[in-house]
Amino acid sequence: MQKTLIIFLLLITMISCAACQKQIQKQIPEANGSMSAEEISQTGFTELVPESYKTEAPRQGKVERLDYESQDYVRDGSVITKTAYVYTPYGYDEGDAETKYDIIYLMHGWGGHAGEYFDYTGTKNMFDHLIENGDIEPIIIVSATFYNENSDTGFGGSVDEFRAFHNDFENCLMPAVEGKYHTYAKSTTPEDLKASRDHRAFGGFSLGSVTTWLEFCHDYDYIHYFLPMSGSCWYYGTYGDFQIEKNVDFIEQLVKEQDLTAKGYFIYHAVGTNDAVKSQSLDMADEMLSRDMFTSDHYVFYQKEGGYHDLDAVQEYLYNALPVFFGSEK
């Protein structure tokens, strides 16, 4: 009931932005397939996931649970144990330290849990097929959580936890994962993790999308690729305090101050045309696209035709974005 009320209030508040939404939709050309960040159009529609990609692949990757030591960054800083689930591709050999893998961290939305991306029907199979068919290089995929206890803490508690998550990511999750699995990081020191940023991505859905924008704000020096799915930047306030321009101002200033245009970064922003809270993403996209700094080799905005605020849409966003991040031709 609480979620329904919040979504309803969002819709009422953002009706006035309909003109902006229509403006973006008019700009969108036809989908253009799996291309690199240098080739992809800045706006478009996502392509459907082939049904065959949702079936079991002959060569299947593995998913395993990883418990790691962290801290309660929301409350008292006490030592806690958190959980993530890690996908390794077919052929991954724990004893082969010479072969390196790109990595993407994925974050759930409100009420979600670690491992959620592997639970949804067909998504793990899709990862297998993307790799087997050469759409992407073999990669490591981490389905993490911003919840300390891996369970819902209500909307307010969720906001507190995802706002603090970047501390867990930098100090605990990333070192735990990349100290165990063979990524491009030579070690888990901040220096080596930052040096391997071109081989690292972060994405999330709904409140996980908001988390992704905050990861850009806090951890741009650790991550090159970002996939915010159905959500805007809340650096300033809950729902960004409906201050999209102010939040984009912050991002623009960050890019300038940190020379990120030269260092490289790429944001694949996505939402469904029937998503109940799409107005946040559309307003964010409209503001980003209005700035000359955010060219198509740094920011794109794609929509799923008929897509709702659900994991079916998320599956399609991943299918379209991963080849742009980690395509086999890169």
Predicted regions and their residues:
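Intrinsically disordered, low-complexity regions enriched in polar/acidic and amide residues
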Residues: M1, C20-K26
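Positively charged n-region of N-terminal signal peptides that target proteins for export
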Residues: M1-L10
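Non-catalytic cap/lid and distal C-terminal segments of serine-dependent acyl enzymes
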Residues: I24-K330
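C-terminal motif of bacterial Sec signal peptides marking the signal peptidase cleavage site
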Residues: I15-A19
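Alpha-helical transmembrane segments and their juxtamembrane interfaces
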Residues: I12-T13, F118
